[in-house]
Amino acid sequence: MTFSGFPPSALRLYEDLAADNSKEAWRLRHRERYERDVRAPMDELAAELSTYVKESDFRESTGSGGSGGVQVLGPVRDTRMSHDKSPYKTYQGAYLDLLPCLGLWVHLDRHGLYASGRWYPYAGAEVARYRAAVEQEDGGAELAAIAGRLEAQGFVLGGDRLRSRPRGVPADHPRLGLLRHRKIDAGRRYGPDAGLHTARAGELVRETWQAVRPLLDWMAARALTPQPRERGVDVPS
């Protein structure tokens, strides 16, 4: 089916889940609503976004293209390493990996819709490679300009970061804010009145993903560890 938006009841489900996140409540009151009001439209949105990415030139710009399509997360939390043992997620997420440590994200929660581009390194060496690129005058200035344009468009540049500064970086470094990052999530949030209950919600995600492309392109070209060539796909060096 064609994606036509999330019903108002989808957001109310997450309000109710925040009030009672128990297995019994899920079985008796939440599960059927989740499948109908959240999961079904998110599956439709994921299919639509997969087609969008496949038909766009994300593949050429990043050296990949998310050939597996947009993946929709399940509702059950992994609580093994968490002090919070509540069993169910308070959001519905979906993601697309473009390259290792680089991808696109969207989620729905009780506040509305959030879409972003993400860099999520798994090792300190990857963070070091990113910081070296930021410290270079040409690459660092380019990233600072990209970040400034995104913030002017209403993006928030979030993600895990140091509270102080990396070792050896002076306190007056012009790009200290960028150098503090250990992960980057550049995204925009949309409330219910932005059109979430219509097909406009899909347009908002596509517009956000398109706007964040310069950041993803910069990461692919300058900050990621080069990947082996596979199936004729050009990988940035």
Report residues per predicted region.
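Long, solvent-exposed, polar/charged low-complexity segments
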Residues: 1-17, 21-23, 41-46, 50, ...
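Active-site acidic/histidine clusters and adjacent loop/turn architecture
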Residues: 11-75
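Short histidine-centered catalytic/ligand-binding loop motif
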Residues: 31-38, 119-120, 128-135, 197, ...
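Soluble extramembrane domains of integral membrane proteins
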Residues: 39, 63, 68-71, 76-94, ...
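N-terminal low-complexity, intrinsically disordered segments
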Residues: 59-66, 78-88, 187, 196, ...
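Sequence-level motif detector for i,i+2 pairs with an aromatic at +2
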Residues: 70, 112, 181-183
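Aromatic- and glycine-enriched beta-alpha-beta binding-site module
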Residues: 78-138
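A contiguous pocket-lining binding segment that forms or flanks enzyme active sites
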Residues: 116-167
